[in-house]
């Protein structure tokens, strides 16, 4: 049987497993969790696996290119502040993501911005960006008075 989904105690999606006839006939096949391991099904699973790998490689290439474009750049933000450079409120990862999105001209997910704590002072702050697939970068965020 070729599993079409993860099945606890049996295997993971795409694996070829041997199971009892009754288990396959009464549980796996009716629920759409597995198909019989025929030549066509094996080819189909292999093609699906290759497509998934190619998609992941494209994503890694795109994220690496974005990291190379942003790494070491200075992103400017304007915020209202009071005496001594203290901000009214703070600059959050959403604010940084919005500024990066304006800088690169396309949407940027705030979950990629890693702040230890919200920024509460004017000046330049080093911010880590986590793109996924173990790709990280750093960007300087310069907070200027509004």
UniProtKB/Swiss-Prot annotation:
Similarity remark: Belongs to the bacterial ribosomal protein bL9 family.
NCBIfam families, alphabetically? L9
Which keywords does this Swiss-Prot/TrEMBL entry list?
A: Ribonucleoprotein, Ribosomal protein, RNA-binding, rRNA-binding
What processes does the entry annotate via GO biological process terms? Answer: translation
According to the UniProt entry, its GO molecular function terms are: rRNA binding; structural constituent of ribosome
Q: Identify the InterPro entries for this entry.
A: Ribosomal_bL9, Ribosomal_bL9/RNase_H1_N, Ribosomal_bL9_bac/chp, Ribosomal_bL9_C, Ribosomal_bL9_C_sf, Ribosomal_bL9_N, Ribosomal_bL9_N_sf
PANTHER family associated with the record: 50S RIBOSOMAL PROTEIN L9
Q: Which Gene3D superfamilies match?
A: Ribosomal protein L9, C-terminal domain, Ribosomal protein L9, N-terminal domain
Q: Does the keyword RNA-binding apply?
A: yes
By what name is this protein known? Large ribosomal subunit protein bL9
Per the record, its GO cellular-component terms are: ribonucleoprotein complex; ribosome
Function summary: Binds to the 23S rRNA.
Matches recorded under Pfam families: Ribosomal_L9_C, Ribosomal_L9_N
């Amino acid at each position: 049987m070729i599993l079409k989904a993860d099945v606890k105690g049996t295997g993971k999606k795409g694996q070829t497993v041997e199971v009892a006839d009754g288990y396959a006939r009464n549980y796996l096949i009716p629920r759409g969790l597995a198909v019989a391991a025929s030549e066509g099904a094996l080819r189909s699973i292999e093609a699906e696996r290759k497509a998934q790998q190619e998609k992941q490689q494209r994503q890694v290439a795109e994220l690496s290119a974005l990291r190379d474009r942003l790494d070491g750049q200075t992103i400017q933000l304007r915020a209202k502040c009071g005496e001594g450079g203290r901000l009214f409120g703070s600059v959050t990862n959403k604010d940084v993501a919005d500024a990066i999105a304006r800088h690169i001209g396309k949407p940027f997910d705030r979950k990629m911005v890693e702040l230890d704590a919200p920024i509460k002072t004017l000046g330049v702050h080093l911010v880590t960006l986590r793109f996924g697939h173990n790709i990280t970068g750093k960007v300087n965020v310069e907070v200027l008075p509004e």
